[in-house]
A protein has these predicted regions:
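Ser/Thr-rich, Proline-interspersed low-complexity disordered segments
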Residues: 3-39
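Histidine-centered active-site/metal-ligand motif
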Residues: 109, 229, 322
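Tryptophan-centered motif/residue detector
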Residues: 101, 125-126, 224, 264-266, ...
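Beta-strand-rich ligand- or partner-binding modules
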Residues: 36-208
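Short intrinsically disordered, low-complexity coil segments enriched in acidic
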Residues: 1-9, 85, 102
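Short loop/turn segments at secondary-structure transitions that flank enzyme active sites
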Residues: 105, 119-121, 172, 235, ...
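Conserved active-site-adjacent core of cysteine acyl-enzyme catalytic domains
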Residues: 244-374
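Active-site-adjacent structural segments surrounding the nucleophilic cysteine of cysteine proteases
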Residues: 169-261
Length: 374
């Protein structure tokens, strides 16, 4: 359904990912995108902090203490308010989009993330990319129209789009409580022909191994063990940043209750954001970008996929989707990881060949959780 109005379009059917680790198949003024963090022409991220959010169209929302909250009045907080960006033109046509946010939503409150796009002059309806709070969160199924569809956390387009717009609705059932929003990041990419950029760039010429604590997903509750690579990886990175989040706590805090999965990418980064970190989903196009994060002492959660024989020294033979932590590089450029699917803690830290890792990561979208101190 294509609608020029700001009202949410009818639910647009997307097949949800089967488990937590499967990678998805791949009249306000225009806002200038933020400086790209990756090579132009393939994928970029627009990151809006409080200054950009405060300059968006606000309805029932105000800036308070460095975050956007519901606009309190004498009767308390209203039931809802919206933050709507201007239409953001992109320097290249894109076919895939993943939004992220850093927010808080105490008991009785929540937020909704929506995206719409302009494709060849036609504006889509609003697609819901998540309903989120600290205690309840879920993706929205059955969203499909002629322009695109939602696959859990990812907007996939049938037509190339040249612009997008986001809208966040802050919701409260308690007049004494409000959610707050401090960061929105939107990654968009053209994936039909794969990400351009060097698959294997030169080795960094230095050795670095960040002291990321080790955790194994296979030590978790048996019925969850094979489904929780993402929260286990996230827990390792949070512990690196001195946030005492246990693996079970993170598992509970990222679960997509609509699909019963734990690998909803924005829900994982939102959990990190709720701990006071800056965290969002991005895509990289080369190993150099990954090296830059390690050089800045920032471990990265990456999403990989591989068939038998494609990744030597892995604890498993193959996977249709898996997340792990990149913690460093050897002197010859190989990749040091914490792989959560290792059977015990002693085997979590591993080294993967540089070319093989680049192939199983970048060839399948280069997805990364970028997590840093705010």
């Amino acid at each position: 359904v294509v609608s020029p109005t700001p009202d949410p379009s009818p639910p647009i059917n997307a097949t949800a990912r089967a488990d937590a680790t499967v990678i998805p198949t791949a009249s306000r003024p225009i806002v200038t995108p933020a400086t790209p963090t990756t090579e132009p022409g393939t994928t970029q991220v627009v990151k809006h902090g409080v200054p950009e959010l405060a300059s968006a169209s606000l309805a029932g929302v105000r800036l308070v203490g460095g975050t956007l909250t519901l606009d309190q009045n004498t009767g308390g907080y209203p039931q809802s308010g919206t933050i709507t960006s201007g239409e953001i033109a992109t320097p290249f046509a894109f076919d895939t989009l993943v939004p992220s946010w850093n927010a808080t939503a105490p008991t009785g409150t929540s937020l909704r993330c929506e995206i719409r796009v302009r494709a060849n002059g036609t504006r889509s309806g609003w697609y819901v990319l998540g309903n989120w709070s600290a205690s309840q969160r879920g993706s929205v199924s059955n969203q499909r129209d002629s322009i695109g569809s939602v696959d859990v956390d990812t907007l996939k387009l049938n037509l190339p789009a040249q612009a997008f717009q986001y809208r966040f609705t802050l919701i409260s059932a308690d007049p004494k409580q409000t959610p707050s929003l401090r960061l929105v990041a939107v990654n968009y990419a053209s994936l039909r022909d794969g990400l351009r950029g060097p698959a294997v760039s030169p080795a960094p010429g230095w050795f670095r191994d960040l002291p990321v604590p080790v955790q194994s997903q296979l030590l978790q509750t048996a019925n969850l063990a094979w489904d929780v690579c993402s929260p286990t990886s996230l827990a390792m990175v949070l512990q690196y940043w001195k946030i005492p989040a246990s693996v079970p706590e993170v598992i509970s805090g990222v679960r997509d209750q609509t699909n019963g999965i734990y690998g909803n990418w924005p829900f994982n980064t939102a959990f990190a954001g709720r701990q006071g970190l800056e965290a969002y989903v991005n895509r990289f196009t080369s190993m150099v970008e990954l090296q830059n994060e390690i050089a800045a002492s920032r471990p990265v959660v990456t999403s990989i996929r591989f068939a038998a024989g494609e990744l030597a020294n892995a604890p498993i033979t193959s996977t249709s989707g898996h997340l792990l932590v990149v913690r460093g590089f050897t002197a010859n450029g190989d990749v040091i990881v914490n792989d959560p699917v290792a059977p015990n803690l002693a085997e979590v830290r591993r080294v993967y060949q540089r070319a093989q890792f680049a192939n199983v990561w970048l060839r399948h979208g280069g997805v990364a959780y970028q997590i840093r101190q705010a």
